[in-house]
Amino acid sequence: MQYPLPIARLIDNYMKLPGIGEKTATRLAFYTMDMPEQDVEDFSKSLMQVKENLHSCSICGNITESDPCEICRDSNRDRSTIMVVEQPKDVMAFEEMGEYNGLYHVLHGVLSPMDGVGPEEINIKSLITRLQKQDEVKEVILALNSSPEGEATAMYLAKLIKPAGLKVTRLAAGLAVGSDIEYANSITLKRAVQGRTDL
């Protein structure tokens, strides 16, 4: 038996989300159908608002409602340090930790030649331009996930940045190989930042 078209479409759309298979998508679709109409309306509005009201900061690439973002505008941040991360969710993880007070730069990915992702496909050019313009920057912390792609991206960035005379550091060991920063607890992140090593 085939599902009615609206349910089938909803299942297909849920399956576009990472980690959602057909069974989970079907369960979510039927749950959505049983939700009060106001909740469904609020849910759909919040989805649209994310797309309509959020964009990338023109300086750091983090998600923001205003440009530049709140972190880039904050005059109390330590402007001598820029932490390079893969995704906006990594910024959130370090901000929740509450120990880092520098600036960020979000790459929106990592180098992955097998997937057709080269330096032009991620936010590297804007990082180099930013470092050339901002004289107060003394250290660049490469806080990339400890995956093979993250490691390769860190080495590539270090080769680009070090000739400019800037200190380039990497998070200390402590994050399991292949683990994502967003899932690390605050204590692990704090130790990784405090114990960072030169590249």
Swiss-Prot record:
May play a role in DNA repair. It seems to be involved in an RecBC-independent recombinational process of DNA repair. It may act with RecF and RecO. The lineage of its organism: Bacteria, Bacillati, Bacillota, Bacilli, Lactobacillales. SUPFAM superfamilies: Recombination protein RecR. This is Recombination protein RecR. A zinc finger (C4-type) spans 57-72. It holds the Pfam family RecR_C. PROSITE patterns: RECR, TOPRIM. InterPro entries: DNA_Rcmb_RecR (IPR000093), Rcmb_RecR (IPR023627), Rcmb_RecR_Znf (IPR015967), TOPRIM_dom (IPR006171), TOPRIM_RecR (IPR034137). It comes from Lactobacillus johnsonii (strain CNCM I-12250 / La1 / NCC 533). Keywords: DNA damage, DNA recombination, DNA repair, Metal-binding, Zinc, Zinc-finger.
